[in-house]
From Swiss-Prot:
Residues 395-415 are cytoplasmic. Glycans are attached at N164. The keyword Membrane applies. PANTHER family: ENDOGLIN/TGF-BETA RECEPTOR TYPE III, ZONA PELLUCIDA-LIKE DOMAIN-CONTAINING PROTEIN 1. Glycoprotein which is a component of the gelatinous extracellular matrix in the cupulae of the vestibular organ. Pfam families: Zona_pellucida (PF00100), ZP-N (PF23344). Proteolytically cleaved before the transmembrane segment to yield the secreted form found in the extracellular matrix of the cupula. Residues 1-19 form the signal peptide. The chain crosses the membrane at residues 374-394. Residues 43-320 form the ZP domain. One of its GO terms (cellular component) is extracellular region. This is Zona pellucida-like domain-containing protein 1. Residues 20-373 are extracellular.
Length: 415
């Protein structure tokens, strides 16, 4: 009997004249089916997590938008979604603000992952994973002929960002250095600034930074004496706070450097500094804003040995191999991965007057010597041709006028 009822319900749903989808933006030929995994889209945004569920398959299953709720909170209207019928197909949208994560029972799990070139606790990063589900209520009866719907979602963010997503988060690393007379611990920090004075830390507006805004970064060390300097080996960016993200863009590594990146100071003092112009990751093409996280693989080196660790770029020859054998084991520390972000960028506006923005104006057209000579020659040639044309016309005019005058001997016959 149950099978008969189920077949009857399916027959009603797929009938051509069915008013099942009402006025919603659905296609009976495409959406007369039960939901599948592809019917939910999850967007891990910079300020909120957004889920979009295919509403047409929800209708086909016998439910309405009020039957869907976050984490079984069907009695709380704040945990329900809303319909957007301006898309195809129509969708039910759920939005979770990062500032109110636990309002509808979402689950937050903190995990610790190693960074690039991990060296103990000095290179660990804490990641917060937010997960939950959207489902339909259980029927009050013992049995039901309607399928239960369940959609799962998950997003990961740096823990510092979840704690206060209105400010930039920067990580610090405690790095130990062994010397002949013992071991000391120094703390490294990666900070972002507004300009080259390195006085005011970078503030990200709620709408994000325009593309090509210049950002200044600094790695600073504490508890160091004058014998040790900071050396940045490798700095790169990722779209997430995970320094091991497969999607990354290198700013500088050895002699390879992004054209928009300028290394101001490295290996010469207890602070490393550089600047770069912000961009967006292509994977965020469907979003108005993009997140950029900065990571730097950093170490400490003795002031006398830092020049030996610096790459030799350009046409100069590589240092003699003997100079590389003079390092003692305690000449450098272990590596530490420092992170900062998110740097939120927007792509819907063009930078205008802003002291922090890179100049986007088109440079005035300038002529080089060769181009100027060619243009001058063409002008002179044109003037000569025009003068010759005028002279030719003048000669033709005089010849025509002379031919009209009749000269000769007087004929006596006509007298």
């Amino acid at each position: 009997m149950e099978r008969v009822w189920l077949l009857f319900l399916l027959a009603i749903r797929v009938s051509p004249g069915s008013a099942q989808f009402n006025s919603y933006n659905c296609d009976a030929n495409l959406h007369s089916r039960f939901p599948a995994e592809r019917d939910i889209s999850v967007y891990c945004g910079v300020q909120a997590i957004t889920m979009k569920i295919n509403f047409c398959t929800v209708l086909f299953s016998g439910y309405s938008e009020t039957d869907l709720a976050l984490n079984g909170r069907h009695g709380d209207s704040h945990c329900r979604g809303f319909i957007n019928n301006n898309t195809f197909p129509a969708v039910v949208i759920f939005i979770i603000n990062l500032s109110t994560l636990e309002g509808c029972g979402n689950n937050l799990v903190v995990s610790t992952i190693p960074g690039v070139g991990a060296s103990g606790n000095a290179t660990t990063v804490q990641i917060g994973n937010i997960s939950g589900y959207i489902d339909t209520p259980d029927p009050p009866a013992v049995i039901s002929y309607l399928p239960g719907l369940l959609y799962k979602f998950s997003c990961s963010y740096p823990l510092e960002y979840l704690v206060n997503n209105t400010q930039l988060a920067s990580s610090s690393a405690a790095i130990s250095v062994r010397e002949n007379n013992g071991t000391f611990v120094s703390t490294l920090n990666l900070l972002l600034y507004n300009d080259s004075t390195y006085r005011e830390q970078l503030i990200i507006p709620s709408i994000g930074l325009p593309l090509k805004t210049k950002v200044f970064a600094a790695v600073q060390a504490t508890n160091l004496d004058g014998r040790w300097n900071v050396l940045m080996d490798y700095c790169y960016t990722t779209p997430s706070g995970n320094p091991n993200d497969d999607t990354r863009y290198d700013l500088f590594l050895s002699c390879d450097k992004d054209p928009q990146t300028t290394v101001i100071e490295n290996g010469r003092s207890q602070r490393g500094r550089f600047s770069f112009e912000v961009f967006r990751f292509v994977k965020h093409k469907n979003q108005k804003m993009s997140t950029v996280f900065l990571h730097c693989l950093t170490k400490l080196c003795r002031a006398d040995d830092c020049p030996l660790l610096m790459p030799i770029c350009g046409n100069r020859k590589r240092r003699d191999a003997q100079s590389w054998t003079t390092w003692a084991p305690q000449s450098t520390s272990g590596n530490a991965v420092l992170s900062a972000g998110p740097i939120i960028t927007r792509s819907d506006e063009t930078p205008t007057n802003n002291s922090q923005l890179g100049s986007l104006s088109v440079p005035p057209f300038q002529l080089n010597a060769v181009t100027s000579s060619l243009i001058s020659g063409m002008v002179i040639l044109g003037v000569l041709c025009f003068s010759l044309l005028l002279c030719s016309l003048a000669l033709l005019h005089r010849k025509g006028s002379t031919s009209l005058v009749l000269n000769g001997v007087r004929n006596p016959v006509f007298e």
